[in-house]
Amino acid sequence: MHSTLYDQMHALAQTHPERAAIIEPDRRVNFKQLFDQSNRLAAHFKQQGMLPGDRLALWLPNGIEWVQCLLAAAQIGVTVLSVNTRFRSHEVQDVIERGGAKWLVFWPDFKGIAFREILADVPASVLALLKGQFTRDDLMTFVDQPIANVAAHTDHGVLTFTTSGTTALPKFVLHTQSGLLRHSEAVAHAFAYDDKTCVLASAPFCGAFGFATLSGALFNGHSVVCEAISDASSLRELIRTQAVTHTYANNALILQVLRIADQREDFEHCRLFGFASFAPALSELFDEAAANGVPLTGLYGSSELQALQAAQPVDPALGDVSVLHQPGGRLIPEDARVRARDPETSHLLGNGQSGEIEILTPSRMAGYLDQPDAAHRAFTDDGYYRTGDLGWCISDRQFVFQARMGDALRLGGFLVNPAEIEQVVEELPGVEAAQVVAGHWQQKNVPVAFVVLSPNATPAPDHWLSDCRRRLANFKAPVHFEVLEAFPTVQSANSVKIQKHRLREMAQAILDTKS
């Protein structure tokens, strides 16, 4: 594996020239074409004034042009600020101002979104910070125009992911070319990619989850299938027609794809579907997967460590397969290690004890862009990343993720995974979905349940409470049930995330008025 994207893609263009690199529903590009087109794009970018050290805001959906821009930027020595296509003027302004973007690439007509109108809402003084803007049509013109190649830049911080910023300003998580390539190689090895591998990338490339899906295949010479706009039906069709072997997606999307399958043969080439638990627990996912003959495994990752950082093993020789369907996993890089720490005493914990998960991995970020102090605080003195996640270790290579530490509940002197209570609440009559948080009441922490009702259901809090007390330890039974039309959310690159901090504020306000 080379240390720069240019060298790696150049090698693949020589060894796999005719193999499809990126496959879209109505077009495709092979490895030689992708390499040549990215070279031309880099030369045109440089001709337009793009310089090493500049930052490029990449505001495109999944597709060939997204990949071309990344490779071109890497060749010049530019840092790509990946921008979610769902972003609006406030977020775009933040990318330009705090992210220091000097160039912007966007697709004005994508998905019926008025990108030019969104930009018009960004203050003129902020847009003036840009050296230039390019549309998708500009890119398509550039890659077809012959031009002299430019020299390839050395390894540098080439790509940032934006954290979701549910409780603070988003951070720009920076990764180097060599770090991305090293992790991609580990992913390809861990999932046993071979000459027949074809990976479906449904999550946005702008997020760590989608990018790791892309890079693990593409940078190792395997085909990647993607589309700019996806739904369960279109993804099912791509899986069937493109002989997809692997895909990694959120659990809700995988369930939708499996539900609409016409026959098991739709998935005859599939070797593994990896799922991340972005949605509340979906037990029917495993039944649908079994009915369709699709192997499933739980995943784990983050922007700081890269996604597909861990996957539960399917082979008993590699770890405990009894937790196959739980998030977390066996660490993908062979030299990565995991441990758990008590968040209150700071003592390291033994296997099976819940605490904050800490991970040591070569896939770690280079830092937070322009925030060295924040990056320093993210790691222990011996290099482990403080994930902020609650979980327990099976070994120093495998663990189970339970919840975000901020979401974990300290009840009755114990750390409690809210999903344990939520599962019980969601089985109550009339409850469609539940979120449980803790608040302070009568000198102790107590759980509060927020619920969304099933259609035509009527709230029954007294019955719900007695049922919970029958099925759970008393300290886990919610002291209050609050009915909402919908949970407060924030959009991230991979999913819509429920704002637990907002629910905690609401819960405390309720408890403050409770006798």
Residue ranges and their predicted role:
Residues 2, 10, 18-49, 54-63, ...:
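Conserved AMP-binding/adenylate-forming core of the ANL superfamily
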Residues 30-32, 158-182:
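Conserved AMP-binding A3 loop
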Residues 87-94, 104-108, 247, 361, ...:
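AMP-binding/adenylate-forming catalytic core of the ANL superfamily
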Residues 330-337, 345-378, 416:
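Conserved ATP/PPi-binding loop(s) of AMP-dependent carboxylate-activating enzymes
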Residues 181-198, 206-246, 260-261:
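Conserved AMP-binding/adenylation subdomain of ANL enzymes
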Residues 409, 435-440, 448-450, 465-515:
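Conserved C-terminal "lid"/linker of ANL adenylate-forming enzymes
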Residues 244-249, 258-322, 337:
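Gly/Ser/Thr-rich phosphate-binding loop
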Residues 47-48, 75-144, 148, 455-457:
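Structural core segment of the AMP-binding/adenylate-forming
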